[in-house]
Amino acid sequence: MTKYIFVTGGVVSSLGKGITAASLGRLLKNRGLNVTIQKFDPYINVDPGTMSPYQHGEVFVTDDGAETDLDLGHYERFIDINLNKYSNVTTGKIYSSVLQKERRGEYLGGTVQVIPHITNEIKERVYRSGRETNADVVITEIGGTVGDIESLPFLEAIRQIKSDIGRDNVMYIHCTLIPYLKAAGEMKTKPTQHSVKELRSLGIQPNIIVVRTELPVSQDMKDKLALFCDIDTKAVIEARDADTLYAVPLSLQEQNMDQIVCDHLKLDNPAADMTEWTALVNKVRNLSKKTKIALVGKYVELQDAYISVVEALRHAGYSFDTDVEVKWVNAEHVTAENVQELVGDTDGILVPGGFGDRGVEGKIVAIQYARENKVPFLGICLGMQLASIEFARNVLGLEGANSSEINPDTPYAIIDLLPEQKDVEDLGGTLRLGLYPCKLSEETNAYNAYNEPVVYERHRHRYEFNNQFRPDMEKEGFVFSGTSPDGRLVEIIELKDHPWFVAAQFHPELVSRPNRPQPLFHDFVRASITNKESK
């Protein structure tokens, strides 16, 4: 029978529930269990696809085209699985589904209520995740903090699941904070006690408490928490700030967290073999070289907006025993006069995805600098579109060349709306989303990176390269090295007379893994290291 683990949070948000859940998933997978994982977000948006990155961080896209929470990126990178649309559920999705059923008459004229209709829909999403993946264990993270009014239906639903399928099949893990008060020189357990008290008042008794802390938690403090929270002392797990996220699974294993889980859920699996993971963490902690990459974006104040890009750069660096330092460059501040000052000390330049016109001209200036000064360059999504526009303007001499998204009246729409998007009015969930094939041309940097004729990558875009400009740009050394299999859509571009200048319409960062870097990032970082060594 499938087992269910629920991870909740208390005291404050951003405690690392997602990392805790992902780390536990890694440990259970390494015990030979088939693990899947999902995130429940209490906000009323149907998905984060139309939310500002300042509100939510990056939007993580799954193979099947779901626009999801950035925690799913952590889940995929840690557990090394590909998740799907069932892996992220919001209050908006739940209510939308229930209201559609009500309109279809599925409730037979009854009064639709939070209990049982909303809670039953939530429970169905939990069970469906297990059915669709045939998982041994389903880990569900509940977003937000215990005590939030938005979370109440989710907490009631997961309380009911224990009654539905039995205590041996359900486990509750609660993540809290033990703050350190400098003035008093003390760590305080009272916020955790109150958080657990609140959770218990809702009918949920946590089986494990994971406490975030800056300093070590004494045995006396663990005993005190265990007494007041009614759990075993060994089930108080310390989660101190780590030097690398990838060390967290090892810390949890050292405290036998995965064994406690298996004992409670009656799972008789051998101990997790973390030899390979330990080697990875040791490598990360002992990188001997450095390279600096300029990330030129418009959301650089909130680095979570580009979290998968940064992780993909780091993964690539691990392959070369190199610590990749990211220099955050606000695209709105970049001009032709100061670009040398802002990016001249870096070994490579990356322009990530985005929407809208803010910061576009600064990104184009940075791309021109990379092209003219032979600096390794990687463009992603909008970065690929702007690389095409920069080339059209400054090599072909097409003054005013632009994207019809940014300037609908441009005389040269190098980037234009996909034909199937012409009549689309809704913004949410209507882009070209998910995994699509890309055919590569031989003897190109893209082909050399993948070493395969056809690759599959995840997309999230509405605009595409305008094919009427392909012949003129090819004549000037602009290479279309990757296209859709029918040749209609441009997927990857690069430059002939440049050491390494590649840009992709898709989002390669979404499939990178710490022990298996994404090929374009791998070769981009290698080119950046070579550039540094040649200076």
UniProtKB/Swiss-Prot annotation:
It comes from the Bacteria. Pfam families: CTP_synth_N (PF06418), GATase (PF00117). UTP binds at S13, K188, T189, K190, P191, T192, Q193, K224. InterPro entries: Class_I_gatase-like, CTP_synthase, CTP_synthase_N, GATASE, GATase1_CTP_Synthase, P-loop_NTPase. The keyword Nuclease does not apply. CTP binds at S13, D148, I149, E150, K188, T189, K190, P191, T192, Q193, K224. Residues 1-267 are annotated as: Amidoligase domain. This is CTP synthase. It comes from Bacillus cereus (strain G9842). The gene is pyrG.
